[in-house]
Amino acid sequence: MPIFKCPQKSEPLWKEWDQKAQKNGLRHQVFAVNGDHYVGEWKDNVKHGKGTQVWKKNGAIYEGDWKSGKRDGYGTLSLPDQETGKYKRAYSGWWKGDKKCGYGIQFFGPKEYYEGDWCGNQRSGWGRMYYSNGDIYEGQWRNDKPEGEGMLRLKNGNRYEGNWQRGVKNGSGRFFHLDHGQLFEGFWVDDVAKCGTMIDFGRDEAPQPTQFPIPEVKILDPDGVLEEALAMFKKTKEEGD
């Protein structure tokens, strides 16, 4: 008696190819049609886990964490130097949704860099900025500019401590003229001191002290005069806004 066997069902060839094309786990190297290439881990056909991406257009290299196809977690971005061709670190820190977010260090030049908080690719929160001219700003940031309480220490040792808005001195603050041994305390509007008081401060230790000390203020109520002037400037500023 003949024995009949059911023929085995085979999947279409296109489906087999599609399964082989699905990317999961570690892949040695995957090239995109635009020339970019990626080496690292995948999940459900997208970059996920540890990996390195190289962009052909600008030569940038990112090494670090990925999540759902985007830079997410800790990673380092490097860019080629236009003159030497050697790679230089541009940013090391945390990412979220393909943008700098959390603590990180951004290098703007050989002697200029920022270390601190980021949000949506912008400096936001607390941070310290080292400028190429030797100045250092340390304090609060918002929308990629100093905003809130902060201190700017100049190369010569003089410093400003006080309020900032839109990247410049705005509001109450103190400026220490340590080279001349004086301290100015007052109110700033758009980086210009509008009113305040100047006193001697560390004049004996100053490298270039003023010729004569500042005489004692004879106003009966200097604090009251300053408060009145501040109120006037604040009112004028509010009306202008």
From Swiss-Prot:
A GO cellular component annotated for this chain's UniProt record is: acrosomal vesicle
Give the source species: Bos taurus (Bovine)
Instruction: Specify the superkingdom.
Output: Eukaryota
Q: Mind telling me what this protein is named?
A: MORN repeat-containing protein 3
Region ranges (Interaction with SIRT1): 76-100
Q: Name one Pfam family in it.
A: MORN
Subunit organization: Interacts with MEIG1. Interacts with TP53, MDM2 and SIRT1; the interactions mediate post-transcriptional modifications of TP53 by MDM2 and SIRT1.
Which keywords appear in this protein's UniProt record, sorted alphabetically? Cytoplasmic vesicle, Repeat
Q: Where in the cell is it found?
A: Cytoplasmic vesicle, Secretory vesicle, Acrosome
SMART domains (alphabetical): MORN
